[in-house]
Amino acid sequence: MSITSVPGVVDAGVLGAQSAAAVRENALLSSSLWVNVALAGIAILVFVYMGRTIRPGRPRLIWGATLMIPLVSISSYLGLLSGLTVGMIEMPAGHALAGEMVRSQWGRYLTWALSTPMILLALGLLADVDLGSLFTVIAADIGMCVTGLAAAMTTSALLFRWAFYAISCAFFVVVLSALVTDWAASASSAGTAEIFDTLRVLTVVLWLGYPIVWAVGVEGLALVQSVGVTSWAYSVLDVFAKYVFAFILLRWVANNERTVAVAGQTLGTMSSDD
Protein backbone atom coordinates (compact mmCIF):
# COMPACT_ATOMS: atom_id res chain seq x y z
CA MET A 1 0.00 0.00 0.00
CA SER A 2 1.33 3.44 -0.91
CA ILE A 3 1.77 5.92 1.92
CA THR A 4 -0.39 8.39 0.01
CA SER A 5 -3.33 5.96 0.29
CA VAL A 6 -3.20 5.75 4.06
CA PRO A 7 -5.97 7.89 5.61
CA GLY A 8 -4.64 10.91 7.49
CA VAL A 9 -1.14 10.63 6.01
CA VAL A 10 -0.06 13.34 3.58
CA ASP A 11 2.73 12.83 1.08
CA ALA A 12 5.58 15.05 2.27
CA GLY A 13 6.82 15.37 -1.30
CA VAL A 14 3.48 16.77 -2.42
CA LEU A 15 3.46 19.26 0.45
CA GLY A 16 7.00 20.34 -0.36
CA ALA A 17 6.16 20.86 -4.02
CA GLN A 18 3.07 22.86 -3.11
CA SER A 19 5.03 25.02 -0.66
CA ALA A 20 7.77 25.66 -3.21
CA ALA A 21 5.20 26.62 -5.83
CA ALA A 22 3.47 28.98 -3.40
CA VAL A 23 6.78 30.66 -2.57
CA ARG A 24 7.63 31.10 -6.26
CA GLU A 25 4.21 32.56 -7.02
CA ASN A 26 4.65 35.21 -4.31
CA ALA A 27 7.11 37.60 -5.97
CA LEU A 28 7.64 39.64 -2.81
CA LEU A 29 8.39 36.56 -0.73
CA SER A 30 10.60 34.77 -3.26
CA SER A 31 12.64 37.90 -4.01
CA SER A 32 13.42 38.32 -0.31
CA LEU A 33 14.88 34.81 -0.32
CA TRP A 34 16.77 34.94 -3.62
CA VAL A 35 18.52 38.15 -2.62
CA ASN A 36 19.97 36.40 0.41
CA VAL A 37 21.01 33.35 -1.60
CA ALA A 38 22.94 35.63 -3.97
CA LEU A 39 24.53 37.70 -1.20
CA ALA A 40 25.42 34.63 0.85
CA GLY A 41 27.09 33.09 -2.20
CA ILE A 42 29.10 36.25 -2.83
CA ALA A 43 30.02 36.45 0.87
CA ILE A 44 31.33 32.88 0.83
CA LEU A 45 33.63 33.61 -2.10
CA VAL A 46 34.83 36.90 -0.61
CA PHE A 47 35.47 35.39 2.83
CA VAL A 48 37.38 32.43 1.40
CA TYR A 49 39.56 34.88 -0.53
CA MET A 50 40.08 37.05 2.56
CA GLY A 51 41.10 34.03 4.62
CA ARG A 52 43.75 32.73 2.27
CA THR A 53 46.59 34.43 4.19
CA ILE A 54 45.19 34.39 7.72
CA ARG A 55 47.58 32.55 10.00
CA PRO A 56 46.66 29.57 12.22
CA GLY A 57 45.52 30.21 15.78
CA ARG A 58 42.84 32.59 16.98
CA PRO A 59 42.76 34.59 13.72
CA ARG A 60 42.06 31.37 11.82
CA LEU A 61 39.41 30.30 14.33
CA ILE A 62 37.62 33.63 13.92
CA TRP A 63 37.79 33.24 10.14
CA GLY A 64 36.36 29.72 10.34
CA ALA A 65 33.47 30.76 12.57
CA THR A 66 32.72 33.74 10.34
CA LEU A 67 32.78 31.68 7.15
CA MET A 68 30.14 29.37 8.61
CA ILE A 69 27.66 32.27 8.79
CA PRO A 70 26.99 32.60 5.02
CA LEU A 71 27.39 28.84 4.52
CA VAL A 72 24.55 28.18 6.95
CA SER A 73 22.50 31.03 5.49
CA ILE A 74 22.69 29.92 1.87
CA SER A 75 21.64 26.40 2.89
CA SER A 76 18.72 27.76 4.87
CA TYR A 77 17.46 30.12 2.20
CA LEU A 78 17.60 27.34 -0.40
CA GLY A 79 15.55 25.26 2.03
CA LEU A 80 12.94 28.01 2.20
CA LEU A 81 12.85 28.41 -1.59
CA SER A 82 12.49 24.66 -2.11
CA GLY A 83 9.57 24.52 0.31
CA LEU A 84 11.46 22.12 2.56
CA THR A 85 11.36 24.42 5.61
CA VAL A 86 8.06 26.19 4.92
CA GLY A 87 4.68 25.12 6.25
CA MET A 88 1.11 26.24 6.86
CA ILE A 89 -0.23 26.68 10.39
CA GLU A 90 -3.67 27.68 11.66
CA MET A 91 -3.62 30.62 14.01
CA PRO A 92 -5.28 30.03 17.41
CA ALA A 93 -8.30 31.80 18.84
CA GLY A 94 -7.59 35.35 19.94
CA HIS A 95 -5.02 35.97 17.21
CA ALA A 96 -5.79 38.69 14.66
CA LEU A 97 -5.85 35.97 11.99
CA ALA A 98 -7.60 33.35 14.14
CA GLY A 99 -8.73 30.32 12.15
CA GLU A 100 -6.75 31.33 9.07
CA MET A 101 -3.92 29.33 7.57
CA VAL A 102 -0.68 31.31 7.61
CA ARG A 103 2.54 30.41 5.83
CA SER A 104 5.31 29.83 8.38
CA GLN A 105 8.97 30.10 7.39
CA TRP A 106 10.07 27.94 10.29
CA GLY A 107 13.39 27.27 8.56
CA ARG A 108 14.54 30.76 9.55
CA TYR A 109 14.68 29.65 13.17
CA LEU A 110 16.84 26.69 12.20
CA THR A 111 19.17 29.12 10.44
CA TRP A 112 19.40 31.41 13.44
CA ALA A 113 20.02 28.47 15.79
CA LEU A 114 23.08 27.55 13.70
CA SER A 115 24.37 30.91 12.46
CA THR A 116 23.99 33.16 15.51
CA PRO A 117 26.19 30.90 17.68
CA MET A 118 28.90 31.36 15.03
CA ILE A 119 28.51 35.13 15.31
CA LEU A 120 28.86 34.93 19.07
CA LEU A 121 31.78 32.51 18.81
CA ALA A 122 33.61 34.96 16.55
CA LEU A 123 32.88 37.83 18.93
CA GLY A 124 33.95 35.77 21.93
CA LEU A 125 37.22 34.85 20.26
CA LEU A 126 37.79 38.47 19.33
CA ALA A 127 37.20 39.61 22.92
CA ASP A 128 39.14 36.65 24.36
CA VAL A 129 36.35 35.77 26.78
CA ASP A 130 36.66 32.79 29.10
CA LEU A 131 35.26 29.45 27.99
CA GLY A 132 32.54 29.39 30.66
CA SER A 133 31.12 32.72 29.56
CA LEU A 134 31.26 31.72 25.91
CA PHE A 135 29.39 28.48 26.59
CA THR A 136 26.72 30.23 28.66
CA VAL A 137 26.04 32.92 26.08
CA ILE A 138 25.91 30.51 23.15
CA ALA A 139 23.61 28.17 25.11
CA ALA A 140 21.31 31.12 25.88
CA ASP A 141 21.37 32.09 22.22
CA ILE A 142 20.33 28.62 21.10
CA GLY A 143 17.61 28.65 23.76
CA MET A 144 16.42 31.98 22.36
CA CYS A 145 16.13 30.52 18.85
CA VAL A 146 14.42 27.28 19.92
CA THR A 147 11.81 29.04 22.06
CA GLY A 148 11.31 31.54 19.24
CA LEU A 149 10.50 28.60 16.97
CA ALA A 150 8.09 27.28 19.61
CA ALA A 151 6.38 30.68 19.74
CA ALA A 152 5.99 30.71 15.96
CA MET A 153 4.71 27.13 15.63
CA THR A 154 2.42 26.79 18.67
CA THR A 155 -1.23 26.67 17.59
CA SER A 156 -2.99 25.32 20.68
CA ALA A 157 -3.43 28.67 22.42
CA LEU A 158 -2.40 32.28 21.87
CA LEU A 159 -1.19 32.49 25.48
CA PHE A 160 1.39 29.77 24.84
CA ARG A 161 2.71 31.60 21.78
CA TRP A 162 3.37 34.74 23.80
CA ALA A 163 4.71 32.73 26.75
CA PHE A 164 7.36 31.18 24.49
CA TYR A 165 8.03 34.63 23.03
CA ALA A 166 8.63 36.01 26.53
CA ILE A 167 11.00 33.15 27.38
CA SER A 168 12.87 33.73 24.13
CA CYS A 169 13.25 37.40 25.02
CA ALA A 170 14.56 36.41 28.47
CA PHE A 171 17.28 34.32 26.81
CA PHE A 172 18.00 37.31 24.59
CA VAL A 173 18.54 39.52 27.64
CA VAL A 174 21.24 37.10 28.84
CA VAL A 175 23.04 37.45 25.50
CA LEU A 176 22.72 41.24 25.44
CA SER A 177 23.91 41.54 29.03
CA ALA A 178 27.11 39.64 28.25
CA LEU A 179 27.82 41.67 25.12
CA VAL A 180 27.33 44.97 26.91
CA THR A 181 29.17 44.17 30.15
CA ASP A 182 31.50 41.18 30.58
CA TRP A 183 32.52 40.74 26.97
CA ALA A 184 33.16 44.44 26.52
CA ALA A 185 35.50 44.38 29.52
CA SER A 186 37.31 41.33 28.12
CA ALA A 187 37.76 43.04 24.76
CA SER A 188 39.28 46.04 26.49
CA SER A 189 41.81 43.80 28.24
CA ALA A 190 42.55 41.97 24.98
CA GLY A 191 43.24 45.18 23.08
CA THR A 192 40.36 44.66 20.66
CA ALA A 193 37.90 47.07 22.28
CA GLU A 194 37.55 49.44 19.33
CA ILE A 195 36.46 46.86 16.75
CA PHE A 196 34.50 44.90 19.36
CA ASP A 197 32.51 48.00 20.31
CA THR A 198 31.66 48.63 16.66
CA LEU A 199 30.51 45.06 16.12
CA ARG A 200 28.70 44.97 19.45
CA VAL A 201 26.62 48.05 18.59
CA LEU A 202 25.86 46.62 15.14
CA THR A 203 24.83 43.28 16.64
CA VAL A 204 22.72 44.66 19.49
CA VAL A 205 20.83 47.14 17.32
CA LEU A 206 20.13 44.67 14.52
CA TRP A 207 19.29 41.73 16.77
CA LEU A 208 16.73 43.88 18.58
CA GLY A 209 14.95 44.16 15.26
CA TYR A 210 14.09 40.45 15.10
CA PRO A 211 11.71 40.26 18.10
CA ILE A 212 10.17 43.55 16.96
CA VAL A 213 9.46 42.15 13.49
CA TRP A 214 8.03 39.00 15.10
CA ALA A 215 5.75 41.03 17.35
CA VAL A 216 4.31 43.25 14.61
CA GLY A 217 4.30 40.61 11.86
CA VAL A 218 1.91 37.79 11.06
CA GLU A 219 3.28 35.58 13.82
CA GLY A 220 2.61 38.14 16.56
CA LEU A 221 0.09 40.96 16.59
CA ALA A 222 -0.33 40.82 12.80
CA LEU A 223 -0.15 44.59 12.46
CA VAL A 224 1.66 43.70 9.23
CA GLN A 225 -0.22 40.80 7.65
CA SER A 226 1.90 40.31 4.56
CA VAL A 227 4.22 37.30 4.78
CA GLY A 228 6.30 38.83 1.99
CA VAL A 229 6.82 42.11 3.85
CA THR A 230 7.72 40.24 7.03
CA SER A 231 10.15 38.07 5.09
CA TRP A 232 11.82 41.13 3.58
CA ALA A 233 12.21 42.64 7.05
CA TYR A 234 13.95 39.50 8.29
CA SER A 235 16.07 39.30 5.14
CA VAL A 236 17.30 42.89 5.42
CA LEU A 237 18.23 42.29 9.06
CA ASP A 238 20.07 39.13 8.02
CA VAL A 239 22.09 40.98 5.37
CA PHE A 240 23.48 43.48 7.86
CA ALA A 241 23.63 41.24 10.95
CA LYS A 242 25.46 38.48 9.06
CA TYR A 243 27.26 39.49 5.88
CA VAL A 244 28.08 43.11 6.70
CA PHE A 245 29.03 42.14 10.25
CA ALA A 246 31.24 39.31 9.00
CA PHE A 247 32.97 41.44 6.37
CA ILE A 248 33.84 44.17 8.88
CA LEU A 249 35.17 41.57 11.33
CA LEU A 250 37.25 39.65 8.80
CA ARG A 251 38.73 42.78 7.26
CA TRP A 252 39.86 43.93 10.71
CA VAL A 253 41.25 40.52 11.66
CA ALA A 254 43.17 40.26 8.38
CA ASN A 255 44.77 43.65 9.03
CA ASN A 256 45.44 43.06 12.74
CA GLU A 257 46.43 39.42 13.01
CA ARG A 258 49.22 40.09 15.48
CA THR A 259 46.86 41.91 17.87
CA VAL A 260 44.38 39.04 17.71
CA ALA A 261 47.06 36.37 18.09
CA VAL A 262 48.71 37.88 21.17
CA ALA A 263 45.55 39.25 22.80
CA GLY A 264 45.34 36.24 25.11
CA GLN A 265 45.16 32.48 25.32
CA THR A 266 42.05 32.14 27.51
CA LEU A 267 40.11 29.88 25.17
CA GLY A 268 41.29 26.31 25.05
CA THR A 269 43.97 26.89 27.67
CA MET A 270 44.12 24.36 30.47
CA SER A 271 44.87 25.29 34.03
CA SER A 272 48.41 24.66 35.23
CA ASP A 273 46.93 22.68 38.12
CA ASP A 274 45.52 20.06 35.73
From Swiss-Prot:
Cross-referenced InterPro entries: Arc/bac/fun_rhodopsins (IPR001425), Rhodopsin_retinal_BS (IPR018229)
Cited CDD domains: 7tm_Halorhodopsin
Q: What positions are modified (N6-(retinylidene)lysine)?
A: K242
Classify the main location.
membrane
User: Pfam families from the entry?
Assistant: Bac_rhodopsin (PF01036)
- Amino acids binding chloride 1: Q105
Location in or out of the cell: Cell membrane
Question: What are its GO cellular component terms?
Answer: plasma membrane
Please identify the protein, giving its name as recorded. Halorhodopsin
Q: What's the source species for this entry?
A: Halobacterium salinarum (strain ATCC 29341 / DSM 671 / R1)
